């Protein structure tokens, strides 16, 4: 890989300096509200106002920053109706995250059972 292409890889995601695709993806997806926005778009296009309503507590400025970043990363695009939708790459990410969603459900059940055991004094 040339120095120029390595440099381009490092700047593909604002704030990511590793040049490694997985680390760049984690840097982007780790930003507040980024995954939530992608999750809300999983069933189809959603307008900015509806997205903000679905993501309680997110400010308009953060929403538009994330929409721009996710668009720059080719994960979402704006439709002809000014809604936002996943690109093919964004939809592929959604499919890749499905096992994590399933794991999170199991993990929540374990945590809930553990909390119940703790409240019962271990009984």
Residue ranges and their predicted role:
Residues 2-9, 19-21, 94-123:
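Amphipathic alpha-helical dimerization/coiled-coil segments
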Residues 15-64, 68, 73-75, 84-91, ...:
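N-terminal helix-turn-helix DNA-binding core of bacterial DNA-binding proteins
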Residues 74-79, 123:
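A short, hydrophobic secondary-structure junction motif
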Residues 79-101:
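Basic, amphipathic "hinge/linker" alpha-helix immediately C-terminal to the N-terminal HTH DNA-binding motif
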């Amino acid at each position: 890989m040339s120095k120029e292409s390595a440099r381009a890889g490092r700047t593909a995601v604002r704030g990511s300096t590793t040049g490694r695709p997985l680390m760049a993806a984690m840097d982007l997806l780790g930003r507040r509200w980024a995954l939530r926005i992608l999750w809300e778009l999983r069933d189809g296009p959603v307008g900015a106002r509806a997205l903000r309503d679905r993501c309680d507590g997110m400010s308009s400025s953060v929403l538009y920053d994330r929409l721009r970043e996710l668009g720059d990363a080719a994960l979402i695009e704006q439709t002809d109706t000014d809604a936002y939708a996943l690109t093919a790459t964004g939809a592929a990410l959604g499919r890749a995250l499905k096992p994590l969603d399933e794991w999170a459900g199991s993990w929540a059940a374990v945590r809930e059972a553990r909390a119940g055991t703790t409240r019962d004094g271990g009984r």
